[in-house]
Amino acid sequence: MAAFLMLRVGVMEKDEELIDDALNQYYWHIKYLQNPSSGLWYHGYDNIAGDHMSGIYWGRANAWAAFTMSQVGGILPQCYLYPKYIDIAGSLNEQLAALKVYQTENGLWRTVVDDPESYEEISASAGIAAAMLTRGNPLHSKYINKSIKGLLANVSEDGKVMNVSGGTAVMRDKEGYRGIPKAYIQGWGQGLALSFFATLLVSDEIQKDGAL
């Protein structure tokens, strides 16, 4: 998430050093957190033990990764001239291809992506759907359309985004993630839902990054 802010500031200030630092942050997050076999992102990494702790594919972690990576091509002018952007685009493509498999019948994703016993979680679902929408791949269209109904069903008449999990540490096991309450309004739920619906309104105007 910090890399996204750094990149935006770097582009606004025309600060190539800050842009490079932001892309470096993306690059090493990919190397340490994405499983190259599954395409999914782990919730955490222990640099001392050299492992992914409980090894859980947390939904919102995958949403943050997908959403922030999807923004780079539209923010960074001539993104294709930055070698690390190719890593970002490749990582995102593989992640979104993997996530499609785990979309539920309700058009949502679960708080533990690959755990059918964990609950559907709305901030993760909104972030993943927003990333698909921003990426602009026509193969994502049916998953995006399915998400619209699922997300709308979890927004109250007064605009509250419901069924958003609370702040979540790297839990010991899947049961720990299943136990995180989702009864309260959370800023990240409101924000990611707004990002999805706002992107939906301007989807025809999104700047794509070509064949990358």
Question: Where are the regions that the model predicts?
Answer:
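Well-ordered alpha-helical scaffold segments within catalytic/enzyme domains
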Residues: 2-15, 64-81, 126-139, 192-207
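Active-site cleft segment of glycoside hydrolase catalytic domains centered on the general acid/base Glu
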Residues: 9-17, 51-56
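Long, well-ordered core segments of solenoidal/helical folds
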Residues: 16-42, 88-107, 143-160
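Acidic/Ser/Thr-rich, low-complexity mid-to-C-terminal regulatory regions of eukaryotic proteins
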Residues: 40-60
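Short linear capping/connector segments at secondary-structure termini
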Residues: 44-49, 108-116
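Oxyanion-binding "anion nests"
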Residues: 66-113
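CBM-like carbohydrate-recognition segments
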Residues: 109, 115-212
